[in-house]
Amino acid sequence: MIKEILKKADEKMGKTIVALKKELASMKAGRANPAMLDRIEAEYYGSMTPLNQLGNISVPEARVLLIQPWDKGALSAIEKAILKSDLGLNPSNDGTVIRLVIPELTEETRKNIVKTVKKTGEEAKVAIRSIRRDCNDDVKNLKKDDVSEDDIKKAEDDIQKKTDKYIKEIDSIISAKEKEILSI
């Protein structure tokens, strides 16, 4: 029972880290990254479709994204989706491809992005702590199943060690992203 709870804690905490990395990858850092467009969906033949399923997204230059749709009819839908997004990018449509030039970040914009990064990191830490609380509750409920106090205490210590490990990993991910944003 305890091993299952520890395994569940590890899986959930790992998923939180994966979600954090995915969220941070989509944040603008002054250089082109196809992951910036992961959250954007365009209306294509009546359904919302992710941009990476509508065409090829490449990075020909450090601050340029190039979107080559497989169907030229999707160009205007892709352009509208990018304009409606919160990225603040202006697409340039030449009839065959869409170019997105990533503007240089001002100092103020960088600081705002860093604030958002820190907030996202805090949310991930809260999620990790919530997982810890749920797992500790599960362990405490094992008292009813004649599990010894020593085993329960050891399991709680193991859960705390996992929590500390994942919180430390979040801190390193966040500080790396901050350096990336501030050093451009």
UniProtKB/Swiss-Prot annotation:
The keyword Protein biosynthesis applies. It holds the Pfam family RRF. The keyword Nucleotide-binding does not apply. One of its GO terms (cellular component) is cytoplasm. Transmembrane segments: none annotated. Its main location: cytoplasm. One of its GO terms (molecular function) is ribosomal large subunit binding. Gene3D superfamilies: 3.30.1360.40, Ribosome-recycling factor. InterPro entries: Ribosome_recyc_fac (IPR002661), Ribosome_recyc_fac_dom (IPR023584), RRF_sf (IPR036191). Keywords: Cytoplasm, Protein biosynthesis. It is found in: Cytoplasm. SUPFAM superfamilies: Ribosome recycling factor, RRF (SSF55194). GO terms for biological process: translation; translational termination. Responsible for the release of ribosomes from messenger RNA at the termination of protein biosynthesis. May increase the efficiency of translation by recycling ribosomes from one round of translation to another. Belongs to the RRF family. This is Ribosome-recycling factor. It comes from Clostridium botulinum (strain Hall / ATCC 3502 / NCTC 13319 / Type A).
